[in-house]
Every structure is written in structure tokens, then in C-alpha cells.
């Protein structure tokens, strides 16, 4: 079985409440339940972590070292600001896919830059919660090939 860690950054605990026209109407718990069903079908153990605190996200990444085969991360607004989160991902050297529910390039200019996309195995944005499912399938495909 492959071990995949899904990390969600700041404000994603408010999915379904915060700007649902941008981020969708499903809450994070429902999304995780759906993803865990998909993970079972792919023979993946999926663990999830969400925090609004940058240092907790960093600790989660550090703790994934040698315990996780792949990371799927939605850094949320930290995408555009967090060099330290980028450095944490580089330090553990675990392949990851960056996911965003909205298309960050169709939004405000300050959201167009990502500190993660150039070091990510893949980048998915603009497909809502389906982006997470696609990332999970791509993580599985990557892990079975490599």
C-alpha cells in the first residue's frame, strides 16, 4: 500500500462557507470522506492534515519524512508567500502535487505566483474538488511507475 499525505493550508477548514462561488459548496470533511473512498479503491492509505498555522504545516511536512510516499498539498494563500514551506518540502524530498480549487491565474495578480509549482511533480488548479481526486489518481500512477 502507498502512503499519501494530503495537506490543506489556511482557511480551507471553511470550505463550503467561504466564497462558495469560488471554492465550492462542499465542506472539507465531505471532501476528505470522498477522497478516502477513492484512496481505498487505489490501495492507498490517505492521511489528511489541515492547519491555519504555517509552523504546524511545516512540522507536518517534517514528520512525513520516511513515513509518506507522496504528498498532495493545497498551500492556499501560503502559495504566494511561504518560502519556509517550500524549504520544508525540499528538505524532506518527497514528490508532491500542488492543488488549488480555483484557477489562480484567473484571479488577482498577486495570486499568480507560486513558490511551489517549479519544484512540484505536478500542478493542478481550477477544477474544484475534482482536482484533489485527479491528484490522488496521478500520485497513484506516479508511485506505481517509479
From Swiss-Prot:
Record has Glycoprotein as a keyword: no
Example GO biological process: amino acid biosynthetic process
Site feature Transition state stabilizer, where: 18
Protein name: 3-dehydroquinate dehydratase
Alphabetical list of PANTHER family matching this protein: CATABOLIC 3-DEHYDROQUINASE
Catalytic reaction(s) noted: 3-dehydroquinate = 3-dehydroshikimate + H2O
Stretches assigned to coiled coil: none
Positions of substrate binding: 74, 80, 87, 101-102, 111
HAMAP family: AroQ
Keywords: Amino-acid biosynthesis, Aromatic amino acid biosynthesis, Lyase
Active-site residues, Swiss-Prot/TrEMBL: 23 (proton acceptor), 100 (proton donor)
CDD domains linked: DHQase_II
Enzyme class: lyase
